[in-house]
Regions:
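Beta-strand elements within well-structured catalytic alpha/beta cores of enzymes
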Residues: 51-57, 154, 185-195
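Short HxH-centered metal-ligating active-site micro-motif
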Residues: 55-60, 179
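A structural signal for small-residue-enriched, beta-sheet-centric alpha/beta enzyme cores
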Residues: 195-199, 203
Length: 281
């Protein structure tokens, strides 16, 4: 019988140089503190000796385009490549120092996809989509020079309306937990993104955050109050800059009813950063 043995969620732009340029010295200090906390989370993940690591993140119109934006997409196959761009955005330049190819856990990815389709989840699949900073910056920050286990990347449409609902993302996380429980694998799961910010897709609000809303989300996760999170609407997530919290909702469904333990929270003019862990037996 399989088991989810580790859960973590964190911001996914993890580059001191980027925050130095965007926010000055305080930006470098805070992202460095966040990265230190994430590396310590990695110590605990390594102790679990997981067979696979599921990573739930959003695409930044790198793997997909307006020709097709899947609500939820499972990356399947034997390996995945990191995104390579000639003129990468500043936050994607961090990829230049990371490995080019990563192993995938083919069996687990296929099970999540196939059993999901059999149980009412209209999932997309990809054999070729590359992964960007949203997937690889957290994984490499958490594990450093240590071996990276086979991954199962899952893309959630966080930005392009209509997005999946918070409740549906939570339900998909519950589906992941059921698939893992029926498997022979021990599994970690990461969700990435946030907290509140407005990316370049929303130019008029770049630089804004919503600390009050972020702290409310954290309180609900720490106390295990998932009902208010299930009722979050697309309008609420949009107004507060919390689009990427949909990734976290998938994780919450997978690890429920466990309560969150905050490892780092830091306010910046451009984004509020967090690193959160769920202690699972």
């Amino acid at each position: 019988m399989g088991k989810i043995v580790f859960g973590g969620a964190m911001s996914h732009v993890l580059d001191p140089d980027y925050y130095q340029a965007a926010c000055g010295d305080i930006g470098r200090q805070k992202v460095t503190a966040a990265m230190d906390a994430i590396a310590t989370m990695g110590d605990r993940f390594v102790e679990k000796k997981a067979d696979a690591l599921i990573v739930v993140a959003d695409d930044h119109m790198n793997a997909f385009s307006f020709n097709c934006v899947p609500a939820i997409c499972v990356r399947i196959g034997k390996a995945v490549q990191r995104m390579v761009q000639d003129n990468a955005e500043a936050f994607d330049k961090v990829l230049d120092h990371m490995p080019v190819e990563y192993p995938l856990h083919e069996a687990l990815g296929n099970d999540i996809l196939e059993q999901g389709l059999q149980n009412g989840f209209d999932l997309a699949l990809s054999w070729e989509a590359p992964v960007d900073h949203a997937f690889l910056s957290p994984v490499n920050t958490m594990l450093g020079k240590r071996p990276i286990p086979p991954l199962v990347p899952i893309f959630v449409n966080a930005f392009i309306a209509p997005q999946p609902t918070a409740r549906r993302c939570f339900q998909f996380g519950q589906h992941i937990a059921r698939v893992v429980a029926k498997s022979p694998f021990t599994v970690g799961i990461l969700a990435t993104g946030g907290l509140s910010h407005f990316p370049e897709l929303l130019l008029g609000r770049v630089g804004e955050t919503d600390t009050v809303f972020d702290r409310k989300l954290i309180h609900w996760m720490e106390s295990g109050e998932h009902e208010p999170l299930l009722d979050l609407t697309a309008d609420e997530l949009h107004k507060t800059g919390s689009h990427e919290f949909l990734n976290w909702m998938v994780l919450l469904g997978a690890v429920s009813p466990a309560r969150a333990e905050v490892r780092y929270f830091g306010e910046l003019p451009r984004i509020n950063m967090a690193a959160v862990e769920w202690r699972l037996a």
